[in-house]
């Protein structure tokens, strides 16, 4: 019996996938990312004007270059620890509805090529699945990608619940 050696195919060629640039932030022990193109600025938390009778996740409003932005606690939206009085505000671009997300910190910028799906857990506290596009790994951390459009739709639906 003669044994034939097949040629080594070499490293498997994967298709060139586009890289997506994101800013990574943390709330408690969880990591999240926002597409870089959806981010206008990052501010240290400063004076936030509180709104009476607002839902708990709506921390208040701030003036961003003469425009009002709603400050939303990412931790409260997702049912996680609240960032408290400290932290950073991630100001989304105006086409995302004048939103400033309150987070604990940012850890930097990175990119990803492939997202993993998020399993739906209907018993989970918070609104994790509604605004998360998927997850990816970076430096051993599991990072959940926030879809700004899904966030805006979720906010709109929350505000219209009381309109009967």
Where are each of the predicted segments found?
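An acidic, low-aromatic, low-complexity terminal/linker signal
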Residues: 1-164
């Amino acid at each position: 019996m003669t044994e034939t050696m097949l040629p080594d195919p070499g490293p498997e060629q994967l298709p060139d996938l586009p890289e997506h640039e994101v800013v990574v932030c943390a709330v408690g022990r969880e990591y999240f990312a926002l597409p870089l193109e959806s981010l206008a600025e990052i501010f240290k938390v400063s004076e936030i004007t509180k709104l009476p009778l607002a839902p708990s996740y709506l921390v208040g409003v701030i003036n961003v270059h003469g425009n009002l932005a709603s400050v939303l606690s990412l931790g409260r939206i997702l049912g996680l620890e609240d960032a408290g009085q400290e932290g950073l505000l991630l100001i989304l671009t105006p086409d995302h509805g004048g939103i400033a997300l309150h987070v604990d910190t940012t850890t930097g910028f990175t990119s990803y090529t492939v997202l993993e799906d998020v399993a739906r857990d209907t018993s989970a506290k918070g609104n994790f699945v509604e605004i998360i596009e998927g997850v990816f790994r970076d430096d051993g951390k599991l990072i959940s990608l926030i879809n700004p459009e899904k966030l805006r739709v979720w906010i709109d639906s929350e505000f219209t619940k009381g309109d009967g």
